[in-house]
Amino acid sequence: MDKLTATLAKVNYPSEVENGSMLLVVTLVILFLWFIIPSPVKRSNVSVPTVTLFNPYLPEFLSRVWFNSTAATVIYKGYRQHKDRAFRLLKPDGDIIVLSNKYVEELRQLPLTTLNALEAVFEDHVGKYTTILDDSHLHTEVIQKRLTPAINRLIPRIIDELDHGFAVEMPECEDKWVLIRPYEVFLRLVARAGARVFVGPDFCRTEKWLTASIDFTKNIFMTITLLRPIPSFLHPIIGPMLPSSRSLDTQLRYVQDELLGPEIVKRRQRQASGDPDYEKPDDFLQWMIDLAQNDKEGDPGNIAHRLLGLTSMAVVHTSAMSITHGLYDLITMAQWLEPLRQEIQEAMPDWKSSSYSSLVSLRRLDSFLKESQRFNPPGELSFHRVVKKDLVLSDGLRLPKGTHICMASGPIGMDTKYVSDPTTFDAFRYVDGDKAQSQFVHTSATSMHFGLGRYACPGRFFATFVLKAILSRFLVEYEFRFGPDQVGRPKNMLLGDKIVPNTSVDVYVRKRTGSRSTA
């Protein structure tokens, strides 16, 4: 019995040493195999210029090998040279075609049978080795039909759970500075709030569920980070070797067999019993049970799998990253802090009584988050789609079946054509604009970090309320600063075209004198 199986219930996250050693082995294996095996990468037969960092006469595999280390530079280079047309990027596992945002209107409403967003996400996130399911839209339907319409009545539950979470996760720091690792704190706060809505009160405060959902998140992104630089034809060799990938399988089985699977069976039995006193739980898990359309969607293991993946990928990690980015920005640009605090205290004099309308009214906070995301987007590319049948665009550009397309959302957000003085961080840039367009969740042809069109991130509305609730309390109740060794804003970590905050930075926090929790 291996170590991971023996410690199933602990749902361990592989250590940096394990993954560091594995990365060295993987690198050596890749270089060896790349030279001895003809590389069957997916090349796209599209008549557009290819953009590389190196001399075009050098071997192509060099550009593919170094893409993950140079992606941002190459993407910006391509955008500067070809922003009104399409260009090709050479990734380790194949070509990707970056389209101009002038094509947005003709592409955004095309059906999945023409442009498939789920398949593109599956490819981009190495789905076969990160356990992503792409065979159903159940979770999207539940979000659109049950979760988003219910946000108003769910806010009190979120606030209640976060009140408990702050008491548990934040240290005692009245009259003294205490060191915390903000990303880890925010990760657990988001996980707690999400769990209250997704799995209900019986699970949301159990350490087993919190550990499972958080560590599953970490292992997904560790696996993606390690496999993205590797050509896909090597994934079957390298993938099973990764400790993070093996941990994902172990964690998933644990959630299916020990946590959510039995809960689903129990709920169905209670409902079938005809007990007049039984009330179905009002949570995401139950909504998935109710809306499942066939035996496969309704299988307890598949429901557990889909819910765990959704909370990990779409709620926990992304929200924690946004809050961490925002905190780093406010520490280094403190002039925006007091106006934000003033708005929050005026809108929510009693945070525990926060409502849907009070959170929506935080226009400065919305604008700040939008500007922080513009400078620190989740990735330089978005609007990922896989072409499912040959497509000819309005200007005659032909996209053959199988082409992976995207748009350069990062460079678009830094283009003077769309943003005045784009290199200046203006936290309240969007406050005086159109009310809908100024919201953090708003998407457009010039703001695509949540995607665009019918397949834009459906969970962004719920996630935004959670992160605004967390950040509004944190800003008002705490002072914060970097330690003496941290000069300036911590540099983001660039993982190919993806951007994440430095998650290993520590921050000093202290309870503010006269803050609501101490008054």
Curated annotation (Swiss-Prot):
Gene3D superfamilies reported for this sequence: Cytochrome P450
One annotated GO biological process: secondary metabolic process
EC number(s) stated in the UniProt entry for this protein: 1.-.-.-
The protein's annotated pathway: Secondary metabolite biosynthesis
Residue positions binding heme: C457
CDD domains in the cross-refs: CYP503A1-like (cd11041)
Matching PANTHER family: CYTOCHROME P450 (PTHR46206), P450, PUTATIVE (EUROFUNG)-RELATED (PTHR46206:SF7)
Enzyme class label: oxidoreductase
Localization per Swiss-Prot or TrEMBL: Membrane
Membrane spanning stretches: 21-41
Induction summary: The onset of expression occurs at 60-hour-old stationary cultures and the steady-state levels correlates with the onset of aflatrem biosynthesis at 108 hours.
Keywords: Heme, Iron, Membrane, Metal-binding, Monooxygenase, Oxidoreductase, Transmembrane, Transmembrane helix
Cellular compartments per GO CC: membrane
Top-level taxon of origin: Eukaryota
Protein name: Cytochrome P450 monooxygenase AtmP
Requisite cofactors: heme
Organism: Aspergillus flavus
Membrane topology: Single-pass membrane protein
Physiological role: Cytochrome P450 monooxygenase; part of the ATM2 gene cluster that mediates the biosynthesis of aflatrem, a tremorgenic mycotoxin with acute neurotoxic effects. Synthesis of geranylgeranyl diphosphate (GGPP) by AtmG (a GGPP synthase) precedes condensation of GGPP with indole 3-glycerol phosphate, followed by epoxidation and cyclization by AtmM (a FAD-dependent monooxygenase) and AtmC (a prenyltransferase) to produce paspaline. AtmB is also essential for paspaline production, but its exact role has not been identified yet.
Gene Ontology MF terms in the entry: heme binding; iron ion binding; monooxygenase activity; oxidoreductase activity, acting on paired donors, with incorporation or reduction of molecular oxygen
Family to which this protein belongs: Belongs to the cytochrome P450 family.
